Amino acid sequence: MTLRIGHGFDVHRFGDGDHLMIGGVRIPYVQGFVAHSDGDVLLHAICDALLGACALGDIGRHFPDTDAAWAGADSRDLLRHVHTLVMAAGYAVANLDATVIAQAPRMAEHIPAMRACIAEDLDLDTTAVNVKATTSERLGFTGRKEGIAAEAVVLLMPTGTT
């Protein structure tokens, strides 16, 4: 077995609500996400990166938005489930790097809590989890404050068991 790299991307538009779930953290905001689950773009991007690194498809295959069982699902539960699939495939997360792209709300004060949630769910030290945020300089849908996007890259290492 060799090292594996995975990349994930997710986006959700804003809709009715009073908070956003990002990185497992509840962030007060004037809107919520339009989504089948809790809409956590960051955790969804991480799930896709993990699944991609193991050639296990994508989040839509494992948690389809046509399945009522996942309606309103806590994305931390999804991430923990994906982590079990990664481990069953004989891999462990070496590290991950993720970016949240949003004009608003500001993410900086929430990043330490996001890192802690992700590290806990993936059984990692927080030093192996990096989360950063950027704007799109008022360009595109994120710049117009119509939604938020996130990207994630993960490095997996073999555990020696399959």
Curated annotation (Swiss-Prot):
Molecular function per GO: 2-C-methyl-D-erythritol 2,4-cyclodiphosphate synthase activity; metal ion binding
Keywords: Isoprene biosynthesis, Lyase, Metal-binding
Pfam families: YgbB
Keyword NAD in annotation: no
Reactions catalysed according to its record: 4-CDP-2-C-methyl-D-erythritol 2-phosphate = 2-C-methyl-D-erythritol 2,4-cyclic diphosphate + CMP
Cofactor info, note text: Binds 1 divalent metal cation per subunit.
Cofactor(s) the record lists: a divalent metal cation
Entry-linked InterPro entries: MECDP_synthase, MECDP_synthase_CS, MECDP_synthase_sf
Record-annotated site: Transition state stabilizer: H36, T135
Gene Ontology annotations of biological process type: isopentenyl diphosphate biosynthetic process, methylerythritol 4-phosphate pathway; terpenoid biosynthetic process
HAMAP family: IspF
The family this protein is said to belong to: Belongs to the IspF family.
Subunit structure: Homotrimer.
Protein name as it appears in the record: 2-C-methyl-D-erythritol 2,4-cyclodiphosphate synthase
Lineage: Bacteria, Pseudomonadati, Pseudomonadota, Gammaproteobacteria, Oceanospirillales
